[in-house]
């Protein structure tokens, strides 16, 4: 790493810390030539391969924008959307690949959106899973109902009042 002050071609790492969101590393460095200190922020690059084949840097804002459209008119806050976009980015980065297909990013979004809002999930899924008929929607709704029934907890019977 070049020193920004004297352009010396080497520096020593004095301290390393992850950023608050854990997506990058902040390093405090010192130049052995001029002894001045400076900070760097290092982030692993992640490229999304578009349908056209062109790569583009991963954008959490694009995830949020797509989810925001699916959530339009739904009781979902901006904080919920931002958290979902962060979780999608974490899931995509956890795969360890430097490049990922745009369609895969959309599919990675689905489980988090299903957890957040089922109607928004159906809207989003209809695009990313290319629904082209009413039967596709019915099938997705049936899967949601089956998943809900599988995790449903029977209601607790009220305890009779003691006298």
UniProtKB/Swiss-Prot annotation:
The annotation note on the cofactor reads: Binds 1 zinc ion.
The entry's keywords: ATP-binding, DNA-binding, Metal-binding, Nucleotide-binding, Repressor, Transcription, Transcription regulation, Zinc, Zinc-finger
Q: Which cofactor does it need?
A: Zn(2+)
According to its UniProt entry, the protein's GO biological process terms are: negative regulation of DNA-templated transcription
Cite the ATP-cone domain residue spans from the record: 46-136
Where do the zinc-finger regions (unnamed) map? 3-34
Q: Name one GO molecular function term.
A: DNA binding
Q: What is known about what this protein does?
A: Negatively regulates transcription of bacterial ribonucleotide reductase nrd genes and operons by binding to NrdR-boxes.
Spell out the family assignment given in the record's similarity comment. Answer: Belongs to the NrdR family.
**NCBIfam families, alphabetically?**
transcriptional regulator NrdR
This chain belongs to which protein, by name? Transcriptional repressor NrdR
Origin species, per record, is Kineococcus radiotolerans (strain ATCC BAA-149 / DSM 14245 / SRS30216)
**What gene codes for this chain?**
nrdR
């Amino acid at each position: 790493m070049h020193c920004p002050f004297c352009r010396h071609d080497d520096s020593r790492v004095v301290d390393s810390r992850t950023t608050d969101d854990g997506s990058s590393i902040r390093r405090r460095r010192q130049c052995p030539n001029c002894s001045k200190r400076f900070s760097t922020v290092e982030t692993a690059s992640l490229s999304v391969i578009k349908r056209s084949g062109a790569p583009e840097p991963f954008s959490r804002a694009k995830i949020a924008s797509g989810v925001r459209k699916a959530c339009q008119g739904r009781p979902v806050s901006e904080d919920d959307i931002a958290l979902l976009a962060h979780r999608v980015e974490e899931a995509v980065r956890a795969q360890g690949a430097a490049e990922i297909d745009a369609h895969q990013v959309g599919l990675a979004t689905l489980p988090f959106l299903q957890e957040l809002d089922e109607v928004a999930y159906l809207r989003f899924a209809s695009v990313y899973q290319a629904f082209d008929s009413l039967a596709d929607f019915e099938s997705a709704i049936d899967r949601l109902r089956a998943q809900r029934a599988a995790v449903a907890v029977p209601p607790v019977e009220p305890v009779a009042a003691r006298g």
